[in-house]
Curated annotation (Swiss-Prot):
Residues 948-983 are annotated as: Disordered. Its main location: membrane. It catalyses: ATP + H2O + cellular proteinSide 1 = ADP + phosphate + cellular proteinSide 2. Keywords: ATP-binding, Cell membrane, Cytoplasm, Membrane, Nucleotide-binding, Protein transport, Translocase, Translocation, Transport. This is Protein translocase subunit SecA. It holds the Pfam family P-loop_SecA. The keyword Transport applies. Residues 973-983 have a biased composition (Polar residues).
Length: 983
């Protein structure tokens, strides 16, 4: 355990964790002596302390000690010191890297328990529902014992059940369902329909898998189906006529495009003059998808065909991505390629990336066995540091040097020979593959040798945990894709240790060293023996895509047996580092584009939340009328180029669009008497009179006091419709942005400018369309919908504030803010005094109607009148403590002094952590920021915030990597790495 308390080369967070661990260990005997009832009752005591103004960190040591003791009693497992260390790091909002088998699930119990005491909900995110159910059941026993409730959120649950699960103190859920529930919550028409209750604290299991590997994959809710199978079939038919000389594939980026020969063939096939004319953009889009589906994507690698459907395969885990499909027509292109039924193409209704969803949580932490290599990305994107937690027992697994062969055939033959050799002595072996097709090839070769084995890939993942759990038995041969049962321990059968433990055989290097380390980590858990080795060939994708393949293969392609020498190993490591950097750049690009959409999405969702709460829309409708009139008077058939008004067109337009319900004749109010400078104000007053005096009275007659529900429905549905059209357009804009590089402009800048313009149109158009709908609101269907909402028995509670009051509050003056700050400071004075007393080990333990009970030190209790000013109480308590100290022995005084020094050291380390941590990405509070609110509601120019400077443009510009030009740099990296092969 010497390493455990070695402070050298440890982060500030770990140093703080060591200090806190010492204090937690000192509480062991105290809580260990409690009865079950008293131990469980600590939850109520902690909640009272929090209600009285204490912070989580004030009760952290005690809460961790209680959780540790409860875990020991309920699960029969006493958390190791390293598990408590990991839990402390998680509570700090960072990533805890704990090696496989070190007990991450147990380590999560104390931080989850502590944060659940706030009563705001804690979410534990897992990579699949099996792990969510398993951990909720096991850890839930501890939480239930301590008086907390536990819920499991599942995909198939209805809204009411989901709401119940989210209302539990602690909710376990697969990560994708959390994001989809968030999107669905922002599509409801009643606040009571939401299932989530705010995003407080989330602990992510296998955090690297979710926040790194899946960061590029957006969550999408689709709808509005369009069925055009003939277009996909014709594009597929055209692509099948092409030969290799008709297109160009970038092996590194997997990008594909037609060359001049291919363009000529496309023009002839589709009867076009110029394929790339703007009116042919839809054909270009279909051809591009067909090219990618037929020439780049491989069956049983990126996808499989299952039950007549295309099923996506996660490239990092090997799992089927259930319920997922490609968007923007790529799914249909694959269906055409495979001769399957072509499903209707859908449009995007709501979307968010994992990066931006998880950044919405007030506090975020994660645990995994492999994250240190990606620490910079965790810091840059999520403001989370990675802390490597020491193992409970020394790691004794042997990681052998890679075996590199010239060809895939030679590699596979060597793998089978190695499996035969290892299997003869009964040692279990786990073979890790990166692709389904590789696992099936090796399986067939093992069958030919008569070697019984089990295969686990995307086609047989239902029994994942069971198959992986058995991989540690004698004579077991298991083939698994990269999923490798993360989260499931492989327990060695008795006698296997003497055989050398579990043998891990990797058949391909992944696109990240972290993924390789995950595979290795299946062996050598908790000090077990084990061995790992990778068998690689020069024909593997890593060599093909990220080295100068022709030169490397030319030099080593004729080698028989394993290739010797440091250089080839160094080239492999350099290629792996290169693809890690490339993928990081890709994820940053996705995030930069999504951040533009995020700002717009946050504005819309904040606006929806306000619309769901208010009960009087009059002020809101007045503002929309102003916007609508601005739009009407911007039409060039009404305001002519010479700034003259075409009154007849204006009157006809108003009668056609705004008088269907009232049959009001705008030609009889003297519009033609108003010049252009007075017309705007005149029309606003007329429309306000028509709506509030006539139309609203019809609503009140039909719906009584709940007429505002009809207004809410119309305004929300209009906003949603415009937003859904907007994001569908933005998705297509993003996918085509890179095609405009010929204009010598940054694609990101073009995307930002266009997205901003389109958002401004969305804001204006949603206001105008809402006014048109409100002025024509005689639709019985809408009224019946409102009546249905009101009669479903749901209790809907809304604040009494009117829209005007909300807006007045939001745009409060600086003087009011200053006054509020002064008041807040005064209110914090008692908290400050109590903190000072806490440092002296003086704390309030109970508060009655007339008296308060204070504790001095460990045992002295004092009753003081509640009405007594706090500063007077402070003087009395400090004086009594001084008297108590004078009666103490020197040994007791020294102990107290040592404890006070520890507290000071902890505070210093906490301040150090605060100072060294990078600034967290600040999100605009759109509900409380007057500028953001005004921009959305009142249509102020939103573009200024979005446009990037030329300097930012250069920073965001993506660097293209050319394989041929990169050879010298690769050689340099390889030679440097060869000097230190253990890097």
């Amino acid at each position: 355990m010497k390493n455990l308390f070695n402070f050298f080369k440890t982060s500030s967070e770990l140093r703080l964790a060591y200090r806190l661990l010492k204090q937690i260990n000192q509480k062991r005997s105290f809580y260990g002596a409690m009865t079950d009832f008293d131990l469980a009752n600590q939850t109520n005591i902690f909640k009272k302390r929090l209600a009285n103004g204490e912070k989580l960190k004030d009760i952290r040591v005690d809460a961790f000690a209680v959780a540790r003791e409860a875990t020991k009693r309920i699960l029969g497992k006493t958390p190791y010191d390293v598990q408590i260390l990991g839990g402390l790091i998680l509570d700090m909002g960072s990533v805890a890297e704990m090696k496989t088998g070190e007990g991450k699930t147990i380590a999560s119990i104390p931080p989850v328990y502590l944060n659940a005491l706030l009563g705001q909900g804690v979410i534990v995110s897992t990579v699949n529902e099996y792990l969510a159910e398993r951990d909720a059941e096991d850890n839930g026993k501890v939480y239930n014992f301590l008086g907390l409730t536990v819920g499991i959120n599942k995909t198939e649950m209805d809204a009411n059940t989901k709401r119940m699960m989210y209302n539990a103190d602690i909710t376990y859920s697969v990560h994708s369902e959390l994001g989809f529930d968030y999107l669905r919550d922002n599509m409801v028409f009643s606040a009571a329909e939401k299932v989530q209750r705010g995003l407080n604290f989330c602990l992510i299991d296998e955090v690297d898998s979710i926040l790194i590997d899946e960061a590029k994959t957006p969550l999408i809710i689709s709808g509005g189906k369009t069925n055009l199978p003939a277009q996909y079939l014709s594009a597929n038919q055209f692509v099948n006529t092409l030969i290799a000389e008709d297109f160009y594939i970038d092996e590194e980026t997997k990008g594909i495009k037609l060359n001049d020969k291919g363009i000529d063939k496309a023009n002839a096939f589709f009867g076009l003059r110029n394929l790339y004319e703007i009116q042919n953009s839809e054909i270009v889009h279909r051809i591009q998808n067909a090219l990618r589906a037929n020439k780049v994507m491989k069956r049983d690698v990126e996808y499989i065909v299952q039950d007549g459907k295309i099923a996506l395969v996660d490239q990092f885990t090997g799992r089927i991505m259930a319920g997922r499909s490609y968007s923007e027509g790529l799914q249909q292109a694959l269906q055409a390629k495979e001769g399957l039924e072509i499903e209707p193409e859908t449009k995007t209704l709501a979307t968010i990336t994992y990066q931006n969803f998880f950044r919405l949580f007030k506090k975020l932490s994660g645990m995994t066995g492999t994250a240190k290599t990606e620490e910079q990305e965790f810091i840059d994107v999520y403001n989370m540091r990675v802390n490597v937690i020491p193992t409970n027992k020394p790691m004794i697994r042997k990681d052998e040097r890679d075996e590199i062969f010239a060809t895939s055939h030679e590699k596979n033959q060597a793998i089978i020979s190695e499996v035969e050799r290892v299997h003869k002595r009964g040692q279990p072996i786990l073979i890790g593959t990166s692709q389904v097709v590789d696992s099936e090839t090796l399986s067939e070769m093992l069958n030919q040798k008569g070697l019984y084995h089990t295969v686990l890939n995307a086609k047989q993942n239902q029994l994942e945990a069971e198959i992986i759990a058995k991989a540690g038995r004698k004579n077991a041969i298991t083939i698994a894709t990269n999923m490798a049962g993360r989260g499931t321990d492989i327990i060695l059968e008795p006698g296997v240790t003497e055989l050398g433990g579990l043998y891990i055989l990797g058949t391909d290097k992944a696109e990240a060293r972290r993924i390789d380390n995950q595979l290795r980590g299946r062996s050598g858990r908790q000090g077990d023996v084990g061995i790992s080795r990778f068998f690689i060939s020069l024909q593997d994708q890593l060599f093909r895509r990220f080295t100068n393949f022709d030169q490397i293969f030319g030099a080593y392609g004729q080698t028989n047996g394993a290739i010797k020498g440091k250089y080839i190993h160094a080239v492999l490591l350099a290629a792996q580092k290169k693809i890690e950097g490339f993928n990081f750049d890709m994820r940053k690009t996705v995030l930069s584009y999504d951040d533009v959409i995020r700002q717009q999405r946050d504005l819309i969702y904040a606006q929806r939340d306000i619309l769901l709460q208010i009960e009087n829309f009059d002020h809101y409708i007045q503002k929309m009328i102003i916007r609508a009139v601005d739009i009407i008077l911007s039409y060039d058939f009404i305001i002519l180029p010479n700034q003259e008004i075409h009154y007849k067109n204006l009157i006809n337009f108003l009668n056609d669009n705004l008088s269907r319900i009232t049959h009001f004749n705008f030609g009889q109010i003297g519009i033609e008497n108003y010049p252009i400078e007075q017309l705007n104000e005149f029309l606003i007053k007329q429309l306000e009179t028509i709506y509030f005096k006539q139309i609203q009275s019809v609503l009140k007659e039909n719906l009584g006091k709940t007429y505002f529900e009809s207004e809410r429905y119309i305004i929300l549905s209009t906003l949603d419709s415009q937003w859904q059209n907007h994001i569908d357009t933005i998705d297509k804009l993003r996918s085509s942005a890179n095609l405009v590089q010929y204009s010598q402009k940054n694609p990101y800048q073009i995307f930002t400018e266009e997205a901003t313009k389109k958002f401004n149109i969305l804001v204006a158009e949603s206001a105008y369309q809402a006014i048109v709908s409100l002025f024509n609101n005689s639709n019985a269907e809408k009224i019946e919908y409102i009546k249905a909402i009101l009669s479903d028995g749901t209790a809907i509670s809304y604040p009494a504030d009117s829209p005007q009051e909300i807006i007045d509050q939001i745009i409060a003056s600086n003087e009011e803010r200053i006054a509020a700050a002064r008041k807040a400071k005064e209110e914090k004075q008692p908290e400050f005094i109590e903190k000072q007393l806490a440092k002296l080990k003086i704390e309030k333990v109970e508060s009655g109607e007339e008296f308060e009970l204070w504790k001095i030190g460990d045992n002295k209790l004092v009753n003081l009148k509640k009405e007594m000013p706090l500063d007077e109480k402070q003087n009395i308590l400090v004086k009594m403590q001084q008297e108590q100290l004078e009666m103490m022995s020197e040994e007791e005084k020294n102990l107290i002094q040592e404890q006070n020094l520890e507290i000071e050291e902890i505070e210093e380390i906490e301040e150090e952590i605060q100072n060294e941590n990078p600034q967290k990405v600040e999100f605009v509070d759109f509900k409380n920021d007057p500028d953001a609110y005004n921009k959305l509601i009142f249509g102020a120019d939103y573009a200024d915030k979005q446009l990037i400077s030329s300097e930012e443009e250069n920073n965001n510009e993506k660097t293209n990597i050319n394989i041929n030009e990169d050879l010298e740099r690769t050689k340099g990296e390889a030679q440097q790495t060869a000097k230190n092969p253990n890097e």
